[in-house]
Each structure stands twice: as structure tokens, then as C-alpha cells.
């Protein structure tokens, strides 16, 4: 543990933000009571507690996360207790990101060992007190292609046509997702809450649910259909539903409302921000997402970021920590480090042993407003002065 108590930290950070950064930490009344509303009124107590802590932590700093961090790393795969993050700084990330698409679509029986490993890592993350978030690069249920198959603009329409073959297929996939949600339990026997990011990066054109394949009405109805089916039909009550547009260039508050499903259908405001090392863009978008968070009373976070194959020695303090300091953002999650035991490729987005940014990563780790696993409060016990309905 490297941290000072959260209460003292909140007081110290109250003066971090510049006077024109209205989304930054408040100078007074930080503990003012607030009431938040989840899209699921029947959410589990642990899910409500996590939601309250996602809100509370924004005024204190940001959680560091890494996709697939516990499942594999640059030179290892499936090692129990493994983590590129921990191998560098001695601590696990605060947020564990994973993708469960292969568990639910046509690939669901293709690699049972990998699927068992992924779910084991989810349980280990929860047992350590980490926060879990999941995207789904789900296959195209109309064409049979992958999530990048944007050859048809009929996919969403067919999903929404009750009784169609695509509708039945998509429901089968959601049934499998619901089974995972119902059986994802920690060693305490409780259901594990997950920040669920369906249809991520919907602002882009690469996916079958993206901007070139769906109308605004179709996307909004697809989002609502998915939430209602999981929540109301299948009884999934441990999901926090997160929208995550891709924001690689400078954006405004209005850009975050692109195809917004409605306040009652979104719990968490995310953004996938692959801005490279352009701090001006990152800061602009962090300010915008923070303002959306405050306006909607919904926690927010950077749900994906990173620079593929980066070599900068000061990346973490200069391009991650500095822009995030003083912002009301709960987390920043870097994309994966592909398992590459020969280290012949450059598909990595975070630190690992031997990377030139190791020392700089440790510097970021030691900052009082960067939170890793051992720094977290009990994220599954309600935060003070935050009520969740």
C-alpha cells in the first residue's frame, strides 16, 4: 500500500483543478449526499455498491485498468496470479477488462479451456477487490461474419424483427450471456457485478452495429432490446450498462450524445480514446466526458486507450497521469498486451517487464491519485453519502 487515506486524499485533491475546469474536484462539499439511479431497479446490492463507489472515486483520482491483464501477458499465458502490471509495479490493476463474445456467439464451444481461464480470471479479480468491465466483439448474427463484418445494413433491423432467424440467433447468444452472468460468482457466493459495454465504439463504421450499418432509431432500439431482454426476460441484475463511443479526435459534450439511448437506459458514460500522445485531444475529451457525467449523474471513465507498440519512456506520467489529474473520471483502461512469447510483434498497449517505460509506470503508480488494486476501498460496500436507486 502506497496510499494515504481516501478522506485526506479528497482534501488534498480539492485544489488540484484549475479554476476554469468546472468538471474537476470540488473545493467544498465533496461529501454532499447524492442520489444515483441505475437502469435496473432490481440490481443486486453489490452492483449498487459498486456503482456508488464508481461515482465516489471520481473526486479522488482514477483507477488504472488493463484488458485481459490476468489472463495473459507479453510472454506468458494462463499463469495463475500472472499480470504484466503486477510484474512491473508489484500490484494488480484496479480494473480488469475482458471480452466475453467468444462465450456466447457461434464460437461458444470452440475453445473451452480459454473460456474457463477467462472466467477464472474474472473470479480472481473480484476476490481481490478489483472492478470488472466487459466489451463484446460479438459476431454478425445475420451474415455469420465477425463483428467487423459491416457488409449489411440489415442486421439490427433483423434482430428487432420478432421471430426472424436473426432475432432467434441473437436471443440465443443473449441467453448464453445471461447464463454467464447468473453463474459468475465470487468465493463469497455472491454474483459478480460487471460494467457491461455492449455495442462499443458505435460512433465508428467498422462494426455491424456502427454508424454506417444502423440508423439512429435502429441503434437505440437495439440497445433497449438488449437491456430489456437481459434485465427483464433473463433476470440479469448484476450488470451496469455502459455506453462507450470512440473519441480519438477532439470532441464536445454534444458528441457524447450521439445515438444516446436515453438517460434511463445508460448507467455509465465511457469513451474509447485512442488519441495517441495528443494530450490536447485527451484533455478536451476528458473535460467533455466529465461534464456529461456531472450533468447526468452517471460515473464515467476511459474504457479503452493506449498506443500500440509505444516506446516512449515517459508515456505514463506525461500522456496518462498528467491529463487525468484533476478530472472527474473513475478509470482509465489500456488495451491488451498480446501473448507474444518470442516478442516479435508490437501488439501491446501497456507496460510489461523489459519495456522502456517501466520506471515511468512505477512513478505513475506511486502518485496519490492513481489507484491500483491494493489502493481500493471495498468497492462492493456502499460509498458514504451516495444513494443508488
Q: What kind of region is each of these model predictions?
A:
Residues 14-19:
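C-terminal motif of bacterial Sec signal peptides marking the signal peptidase cleavage site
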Residues 58-69, 299-389:
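Substrate-binding cleft of secreted/luminal carbohydrate-active enzymes
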Residues 96-98, 256-279:
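Aromatic- and acid-rich polysaccharide-binding/catalytic face
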Residues 103-228, 232, 236, 335:
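Substrate-binding cleft of extracellular glycoside hydrolase catalytic domains
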Residues 219, 231, 242-258, 266, ...:
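Non-catalytic scaffold segments within catalytic domains of secreted glycoside hydrolases
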Amino acid at each position: 500500500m502506497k496510499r494515504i487515506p481516501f478522506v485526506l486524499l479528497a482534501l488534498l485533491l480539492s485544489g488540484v483543478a484549475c479554476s476554469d475546469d468546472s468538471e474537476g474536484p470540488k473545493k467544498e462539499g465533496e461529501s454532499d449526499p447524492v442520489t444515483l439511479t441505475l437502469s435496473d431497479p432490481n440490481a443486486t446490492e453489490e452492483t449498487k455498491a459498486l456503482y456508488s463507489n464508481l461515482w465516489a472515486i471520481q473526486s479522488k483520482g482514477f483507477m488504472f485498468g488493463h484488458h485481459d491483464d490476468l489472463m495473459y501477458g507479453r510472454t506468458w499465458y494462463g499463469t495463475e496470479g500472472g499480470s504484466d502490471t503486477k510484474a512491473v509495479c508489484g500490484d494488480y490493476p484496479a480494473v480488469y477488462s475482458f471480452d466475453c463474445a467468444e462465450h456466447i456467439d457461434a464460437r461458444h464451444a470452440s475453445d473451452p479451456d480459454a473460456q474457463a481461464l477467462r472466467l477464472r480470471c474474472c473470479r480472481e479479480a473480484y476476490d481481490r477487490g478489483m472492478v470488472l468491465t466487459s466489451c463484446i466483439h460479438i459476431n454478425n448474427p445475420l451474415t455469420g461474419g465477425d463483428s467487423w463484418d459491416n457488409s449489411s445494413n440489415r442486421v439490427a433491423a433483423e434482430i428487432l424483427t420478432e421471430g426472424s432467424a436473426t432475432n432467434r440467433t441473437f436471443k440465443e447468444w443473449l441467453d448464453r450471456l445471461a447464463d454467464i452472468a447468473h453463474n459468475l460468482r465470487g468465493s463469497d457466493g455472491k454474483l459478480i457485478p460487471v460494467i457491461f459495454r455492449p455495442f462499443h465504439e458505435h460512433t465508428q463504421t467498422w462494426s455491424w452495429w456502427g454508424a454506417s450499418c444502423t440508423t439512429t432509431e435502429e441503434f437505440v432500439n437495439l440497445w433497449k432490446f438488449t437491456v430489456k431482454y437481459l434485465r427483464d426476460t433473463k433476470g440479469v441484475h448484476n450488470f451496469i450498462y455502459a455506453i462507450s463511443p470512440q473519441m480519438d479526435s477532439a470532441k464536445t459534450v454534444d458528441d457524447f450524445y450521439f445515438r444516446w439511448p436515453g438517460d434511463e437506459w445508460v448507467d455509465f458514460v465511457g469513451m474509447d480514446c485512442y488519441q495517441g500522445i495528443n494530450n490536447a485531444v485527451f484533455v478536451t475529451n476528458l473535460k467533455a466526458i466529465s461534464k456529461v457525467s456531472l450533468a447526468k449523474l452517471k460515473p464515467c471513465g476511459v474504457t479503452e486507450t493506449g498506443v500500440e507498440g509505444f516506446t516512449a519512456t515517459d508515456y505514463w506520467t506525461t500522456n496518462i497521469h498528467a491529463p487525468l489529474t484533476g478530472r472527474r473520471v473513475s478509470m482509465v483502461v489500456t488495451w491488451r498486451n498480446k501473448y507474444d512469447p518470442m516478442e516479435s510483434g508490437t501488439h501491446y498497449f501497456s507496460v510489461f517487464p523489459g519495456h522502456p517505460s517501466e520506471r515511468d509506470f512505477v512513478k505513475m503508480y506511486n502518485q496519490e491519485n492513481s489507484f491500483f488494486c491494493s489502493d481500493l476501498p471495498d468497492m462492493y460496500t456502499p460509498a458514504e453519502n451516495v444513494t443508488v436507486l
